Amino acid sequence: MSWDDGKHTKVKRVQLTFDDVIRSIEVEYDGTSLKSQPRGTAGTKIDGFTLSSDEYITEVNGYYKTTFSGEVITSLTFKTNKRTYGTYGNKTSSYFSVAAPKDNQIVGFLGSSSHALNSIDAHFAPAPPPGSTGAKPGASGIGSDSGSIGSAGTNPGADGTRETEKNAGGSKPSSGSAGTNPGASAVGNGETEKNAGGSKPSSGSAGTNPGASAGGNGETEKNVGGSKPSSGKAGTNPGANAGGNGGTEKNAGGSKSSSGSARTNPGASAGGNGETVSNIGDTESNAGGSKSNDGANNGASGIESNAGSTGTNFGAGGTGGIGDTESDAGGSKTNSGNGGTNDGASGIGSNDGSTGTNPGAGGGTDSNIEGTENNVGGKETNPGASGIGNSDGSTGTSPEGTESNADGTKTNTGGKESNTGSESNTNSSPQKLEAQGGNGGNQWDDGTDHDGVMKIHVAVGGLGIEQIRFDYVKNGQLKEGPFHGVKGRGGTSTIEISHPDEYLVSVEGLYDSSNIIQGIQFQSNKHTSQYFGYEYYGDGTQFSLQVNEKKIIGFHGFADSHLNSLGAYFVPISSSSSSLTPPPNKVKAQGGSYGETFDDGAFDHVRKVYVGQGDSGVAYVKFDYEKDGKKETQEHGKMTLSGTEEFEVDSDDYITSMEVYVDKVYGYKSEIVIALTFKTFKGETSPRFGIETENKYEVKDGKGGKLAGFHGKASDVLYAIGAYFIPAAN
């Protein structure tokens, strides 16, 4: 059944029910007293979000699948001008997106539903200017193609209507053209320009067809993740099954030959008579190849040959020293030359993790981690000193797991990898933390000739982080960096850092078996960015880039069609910055791993706490913060009929710690928060909001700081909660 909420001032609240698919959506709007009807039927899980007065939705995307009764949406993610909500539901193979045009917002939804949500689209209106709230209802996303269900275009006409360029879950009419048609069945003689996740018409051409089955004699220009037509030509086909007689021009993302030759049909199965016209990446970073270092390293920087690529060793010392071969992913190292002289000491390294010899100095451990060589420590010129650590002098730690590098084998028994910088490198050169993430992609390096990071531009797509760019500052001048990855149809979000008072201190992220970074978040000494991409629900590996008392001045990593991995360069916070606001101390959240991540960041004060109880534990929390004299409120979880209990902090007092009671409750996918208690500097203790359990954790920073903000995970209940702490003098 088709439905249409119409156009309103702005979206106020969205509530979803779901299980294996999205069962229903219900939306509240500003500018009307009427509440939207639930569109669909009730699911087993309920979740949603409420927008602040100056927040508006700019995009909705998700996944769908085809069942015996037609297409159904399996997941939804909502992007606003401030953050991302979701993913709600389950990611499947077919992706779609409905994005508002530039400087517009979504002001209403329409679509179709039955036992589940079958399709969804949006009405658009101009976004309010900065500093204002509300907007005038504007053009609709309803297309002029009556054969489509839930269409959104990008070509608004003067009368507020638009051509059909996106058709999520609908069917294409027998004649005419459709633009981007995710999930549609394109039949007849009409020309399908873009058909994401649908089937190709028997005649005509298909343009960009991610996940589609392109059959017939039409020419497929781009087929991302789909199958190649039996005849015709395939253009860029990353990860596709390229069969038949068509020639494959570019296939990105597969295996690389060890001899230094370019990738041959990476990630694809090239069958039939297809001719490989172009292979992307001509021996880049020697992924899977062999590495040789046959020359001598005479105590200075060396040049190494990675099966066709050239690397530079910046550190002094013999073979196996600090600057020798920082990263060789998937390859094997052969050192057939002797080390040069370094104050009379010679060092001969090998790829088995043996220790070189250095009279009067401690030899470094040369460790080959899963084919990736990290020179752990290096040749020291300080007699009697032992250099054991990472190539940059830091010691990697894994708070949620154990990481052992001593024998050349990497073991990570937890879900998170962290480089937090226990410093042993005292020189002034930038400290390099190796790239974290998946394998593959082309190596890039923005370098270190910067004073800091000014802007970060992030584009997120259906498979993870598509593209990233960093703008740096040098001597007060902005230096725009290059793009890494390829931007899709979605928008780009920008983080601005107010140099020099503000500087970047850490990055947290998530990657999985797709070898693509799935989500990422940045923290400065003053703020924490929104979380970009997919949340952590127990699958994949979390990582962190951070060095104590240092700031980030540059990035490096690997990227191709997406961002595969990310590393960073750190330098000490300068004396001129030492008097600036130190970064807040983010103390780990206690509780379970399920739920949507929230991160309020750090404020000047926490003025009031609201806690709402549910049937099994804490279902809802709300916090009144103060920043620069202005009040800001954040809420998480789902309010119940029980209402809330409150704890107000006096103006001359502050919270110093929080007790979190957690337990495993039947019906929930992980532990949940059962109760909370707060304590203040003046000795006040809040009531215990909830029921006491045996599993109690105290959240505090151990430095006498004051609690200045919260982070954690929530959906219909509060799954986990942690806090930010700042010096009490603030």
Curated annotation (Swiss-Prot):
InterPro entries: Jacalin-like_lectin_dom (IPR001229), Jacalin-like_lectin_dom_plant (IPR033734), Jacalin-like_lectin_dom_sf (IPR036404). Coiled coil: none annotated. Keywords: Lectin, Repeat. One of its GO terms (molecular function) is carbohydrate binding. GO terms for cellular component: nucleus. Residues 1-126, 430-572, 584-727 form the Jacalin-type lectin domain. Residues 314-323 have a biased composition (Gly residues). Residues 138-153, 168-179, 196-207, 248-261, 343-358, 417-429 have a biased composition (Low complexity). This is Jacalin-related lectin 5. It comes from Arabidopsis thaliana (Mouse-ear cress). The gene is JAL5.
